Amino acid sequence: MLSRIADSLYWIGRYVERAEDTARLTDIAYHNTLGLGSSPDAAARRQNHWEALIAIAGDPATFRAKYGEASEVTVPPYLTFDTANPNSIVSCVAQAREQARGLRHQIASEMWEVLNRFHLDLQRQRTWQGTWVGAENAHLFYRNVKEFSHLFQGVTDSTMPREEGWSFLQAGKFLERATKTARALDVKYHLLMEETASASGDGIPLELPQWQALLRSFSAYEPYHKLYRTAVRPRTVVELIVLSAVFPRSIRFAVEQVDESLTRIAVACAFDPDTGPGESVLTLGPFAAGTDEAARLAG
């Protein structure tokens, strides 16, 4: 396979996943901060959560230079419609569509149509983005972004031959998922633990909704209760999101999928899987360490 084609498919996988992950985190943050109340303490906590979201996005200096203070007024537009932000939802979909445009004869027409249609929809919404301000409209918008990602993945699963191109696209998708999940968990975990430590008493009544929101941002709330059948606790939340071998949005699951994709590419290229690009990436992390590692992460 030509390196140009492989590179484009890899980045399509990353950009579509990045758009979905940004929609997930922004949607949950928007609704979670609304429930914090209006006291001075709640206002400070609300700002901390918006600053955490900017930290997850990875470019706080650029955001502050343009928007100043992080809030529900400034962060969602920056992460959603700002074309100067290469990681905004609009930018990610535009870049995925641009990569796909050069592959019109290499991918199914349905894949191109999904990306092109959603790109055009987003461009239209940029011109009247003020109409989606408000909790309900924002939720519907971000839900549509997630559904677009799911539609694209479904069309891809149904139409793309399981050859090298498929493996490159999957490698990009799951590498992006592992990276964004690790970054989000790192930032959110420390923020919530600090808030719990400063809360009165044991902090459980105050912080339980925040941990539930963290699970919901990964679509992990129902899987958590199915797998653990216990109350929401920091240790088991970390265990699920980091180490679960069966939850598809866990870091371990995503890294294993990257590993499998690289192995398939190595085999297709006639490399030795033990020494070529398919060499296991699991040896680089704590994913085989079991739940003791989760306990360490949870303090």
For the regions a language model picked out, list residue spans one by one.
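Alpha-helical transmembrane segments and their helix-helix packing motifs
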Residues: 1-299
